[in-house]
Curated annotation (Swiss-Prot):
NCBIfam families: PRK00230.1, pyrF. The keyword Lyase applies. It comes from the Bacteria. Catalyzes the decarboxylation of orotidine 5'-monophosphate (OMP) to uridine 5'-monophosphate (UMP). It comes from Xanthomonas axonopodis pv. citri (strain 306). The gene is pyrF. Transmembrane segments: none annotated. SMART domains: OMPdecase. GO terms for cellular component: cytosol. The keyword Cell cycle does not apply. Keywords: Decarboxylase, Lyase, Pyrimidine biosynthesis. Pfam families: OMPdecase (PF00215). Belongs to the OMP decarboxylase family. Type 1 subfamily. This is Orotidine 5'-phosphate decarboxylase. It catalyses: orotidine 5'-phosphate + H(+) = UMP + CO2.
């Protein structure tokens, strides 16, 4: 059975994508952003450095929330074993691929900690032509909602999906299902590899629980100020929603 969304404070709804190649660079970013960011996503690049769990431990010691974004996809027994071990760490979110119902159910049954599992639906870098090339001649939103419902039925706690689909997902799944939206672009589209993007406020108005932001903060002339500006947008959107 899916668990209720994490009880996130307003300042914990911004997740910074810590897409750097080393422990030292990761911690430098955490120190640089200070109190402006309380939640960090760590993904594949840090895994390849061999320092992944050192970073995870360092974040936990700084009282930061951690999102493990490794998009697990394997046979059910292998994924279940991985989730069982990972649930022993101080992790708030973890991603698994949303393509296999049996694997999702096994992952959900193995998750005995407070970690929330998020199913990957359709990557925000993909559009309809990419789906067609994979033999799926449907609109991304339809595929995403279908996978969100399948994930919930399997006991997964939520999804990671484009903000463009936050509204349809929320209407389909109801309030007790986590929606985390990556590819957020505070100033609008910027012509990078993200295709299905939305702004900060729109994601929350449409039902997101949290957003993931990377380059708009990392490439800003003043990253902490950029994060603070996003936090202000989040607070305003939550007030508009009555949260």
């Amino acid at each position: 059975m899916s668990r209720a969304p994490l009880p996130l404070a307003a300042h914990e709804r911004l997740i910074f994508a810590l897409d750097v190649p080393s422990h030292d660079q990761a911690i430098a970013w955490v120190d640089r952003l200070g109190d402006s960011v309380s939640f960090y996503k760590i993904g594949m690049e840090l895994l390849a450095s061999g320092e992944y769990f050192h970073v995870l431990d360092a974040l936990a010691k700084r009282d930061k929330r951690v999102f493990v974004d490794l998009k697990f996809f394997d046979i059910p027994a292998t994924v279940a074993g991985t989730i069982r071990r990972l649930a022993q760490w101080p992790v708030s979110y973890c991603t698994v691929h949303g393509w296999h119902a049996g694997m999702l159910q096994a992952a959900a049954e193995a998750n005995h900690g407070d970690m929330r599992l998020l199913a990957v639906t359709v990557l925000t870098s993909m559009g309809r032509p990419d789906l067609v090339a994979m033999g799926i001649d449907r609109e991304p939103v339809d595929v995403v909602v279908e996978r969100a419902l399948a994930a919930r039925a399997a006991g997964i706690d939520g999804v990671i999906a484009s903000g463009q689909e936050a509204g349809p997902i929320r209407r389909a799944t109801g309030p007790d299902f986590s929606i985390v939206c990556p590819g957020i672009r505070p100033g609008g589209p910027v012509g990078d590899d993200q295709q299905r993007t939305v702004g900060v406020a729109q994601a929350f108005i449409d039902g997101a629980d949290a957003i993931v932001v990377g380059r708009p903060i990392r490439l800003a002339s003043d990253p902490a100020a950029a994060a603070d500006a996003i936090q202000a947008e989040i607070r305003a959107a939550l007030m508009q929603n009555g949260d």
